Amino acid sequence: MSRVGKYPVEVPAGVQVSVADGFFKAKGKLGELTVPVSRHVEVKIEGSNVSVAPVGRRSRENWTMWGTTRALIANTVKGVSDGFSKGLEIQGTGFRAAVQGSNLVMNLGFSHDVVYPIPEGIKITTPRPTAIVVEGNDKQRVGQVALDIRSFRKPEPYKGKGVRYETEVLRRKEGKKK
């Protein structure tokens, strides 16, 4: 069983945290985020640390929400102080991406360009035509936007063409033999 919940979350300088009405709020240089707090746990702010403890008797719900709530609070604090980023790579002949206004325009081998509107609170950059960087303060939204972009053309196992995460290792397959 994981013991993630027992470790306190350190709050860096410049981040203000509060707990009220079943919500944990964190405010920092990259914005403000709110996380709902389960009724199965209790959140305490002690100086520059935030600790989470299960409420009442030792039940499965209390213990599962203990670690989950602690992880959500840690992601919220890191998001408003440092932010999150996810890198994507595009492989394939003629495949490329560019940011035009508030849209990400990608050529992915279709007869048309793929236009993805950039959501509010997310920053997308293209350091080079075959690389995309998704940045933001909410870890879940950054991951979801990266997944949406990847889903336009998932990497195929034979030639490796498509959009992949920069840390993704693609299992290649061998083609048919005569």
Curated annotation (Swiss-Prot):
Molecular function GO terms recorded: rRNA binding; structural constituent of ribosome
UniProt entry keywords in alphabetical sequence: Ribonucleoprotein, Ribosomal protein, RNA-binding, rRNA-binding
A cellular-component GO term for this protein: cytosolic large ribosomal subunit
InterPro entries membership: Ribosomal_uL6-like (IPR000702), Ribosomal_uL6-like_a/b-dom_sf (IPR036789), Ribosomal_uL6_a/b-dom (IPR020040), Ribosomal_uL6_bac-type (IPR019906), Ribosomal_uL6_CS (IPR002358)
GO terms under biological process: cytoplasmic translation
Keyword rRNA-binding: yes
Keyword check for Ligase: no
Endpoints of the signal sequence: none
NCBIfam families the UniProt entry points to: L6_bact
PANTHER family: 60S/50S RIBOSOMAL PROTEIN L6/L9, LARGE RIBOSOMAL SUBUNIT PROTEIN UL6M
Subunit structure: Part of the 50S ribosomal subunit.
Its job: This protein binds to the 23S rRNA, and is important in its secondary structure. It is located near the subunit interface in the base of the L7/L12 stalk, and near the tRNA binding site of the peptidyltransferase center.
Family classification: Belongs to the universal ribosomal protein uL6 family.
Protein name: Large ribosomal subunit protein uL6
Gene source species: Gluconobacter oxydans (strain 621H)
Protein encoded by which gene: rplF
